Amino acid sequence: MASQQIDWAEDLVTEVVGERLKAATRKRGAEPLSHAIEAKKLRESWEALRVWLRAKLLAKRGASIPGFGRFTWQVLGDYRPSDLQDRPEELIPLRPVFQFSEDFCKAHLLPWRPISEDKLVECADLNYSILALRHTSRLTKDMVWSALRDLQRKIGDRIASGYSLTLDFGVGQLVAERGKPRFCFDASKLRREEEQVVPQ
């Protein structure tokens, strides 16, 4: 059965907004939430994450999203990750790598296995304050943190439930079918013209 073209990010946003509105109506004395404002927070946080992630990978650095996973580079051949700084003029062959975090896999009953670290570029942890300040118009650190936490949880729920999912991360797509996720990097979004990226 062919899957329809669905904007999965928008679908996840709609679900999370619905959950937030239900939770707010259950609380006594809580101010009512606006569907449009909650959706805007989630969309803007998601787009900020995509922009940050792409910037890190274009700079040949790894990016770690706490509680979700990491996106990094594997250095190929006889090179080492330190060669990226030591020999910046040299074209060093790289392969993009994605790995879910062990916590994410445990929470959603997904298999997890470690990856050999010796050829991987070190990852920078996502800083929610910097993400909010640099990549959003008015969101606070707490707004971005809670938005991404809720979206990550919903992604995990979808994968664990066996739903088909294709979600654009700005550097490629997270694809899940029948509870089996994989990440498909888009080489055109990961390189500048003078660089060489080896496909997965």
Residue ranges and their predicted role:
Residues M1-Q200:
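Strongly charged
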